[in-house]
Amino acid sequence: MRALTIAGRGAAPAVADLPVSHLDAGQVRVAVEAASVNGIDVAAAAGYLWDRMPHEFPVVLGRDFAGTVDSVGSDVTRWKSGDRVAGVITAMALGSGAICEVVNADATVLVAVPAGLSALDAAAVGLAGVAATDLIAALGLTADDVVLVSGASGGVGAFAVQLAARAGAKVIATARGGDAARFVRDLGAAEVVDHTEGLAAQVRAAAPEGLTAVIHAAGDPAQLAALLISGGRLASVVGATPDQVGRADVTTTPVLAVATPDKLSGLLEAAASGALRVPVARTYRLDEAPQAISDFASPKLGKLVIAIR
């Protein structure tokens, strides 16, 4: 099979041919139709995770996937050949990934792709949608909250804007002007502030009584936390710590997205019904996947998705 790989320490991401691994009991072989790019893939490709996660070379990049069941291992009764499924690879080691033609997944982590939802959209939800869900839960957002979403036009941020608005909170989103501002407004942001031009003054104008919560998906956590009222909350998907936030009167929660079938299934159902918009910024072919890794850090409106077949 073809896969987006890192051959060894210091190697650049490249599409390579790999053997398909043996299908174990309890596993499902999925013919992958689409996968998406997340920050963990870019960090792995850049070598930032060498000392943080075990690496089993060649590392196949990618966490999110959607496709069709090809075959099932012994003891699997929930799935059959031809079923449309999606999943998130949750292993704490880097090795088996999702940006490839075939994934052998534990049957218990898969969810059904609802009728009417494309594989591209199902794959785009994945880890970013789960991270946004976990951020909202960490903050416990309600209609009484005024929340700033930083990095609102990226994958996690775009889902977080929608979920925060659905929770009833007033959402202030950071985005550059023009298309990015229109994009986050369409997702449910009540106000948009340009993080490149006097962020504090813009936020104070949009929320004169101060912010009660911050979703930190980008930017300086201390700068964002300074805009919170005393007793406010900051949830960070990029690992901000209380020391980095620098305020003892603010609750800081680092969020590590935990993908479960229940969370993913709920997100896919919401996407299929139209209650959740799946923001796909660009779609790449598998042979263009290394470029998607390179493009991840550039400004974009939503997720980067790889069409496998």
For the regions a language model picked out, list residue spans one by one.
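Conserved beta-strand positions in the Rossmann-like core of class I SAM-dependent methyltransferases
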Residues: 70, 172, 235
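Short amphipathic alpha-helix with an adjacent loop that forms part of the alpha/beta core around
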Residues: 198-209
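Mid-domain Rossmann-like dinucleotide-binding core that forms the NAD(H)/NADP(H) cofactor-binding site
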Residues: 123-197
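NAD(P)H dinucleotide-binding glycine-rich loop of Rossmann-like/cofactor-binding domains
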Residues: 31, 78, 88-151
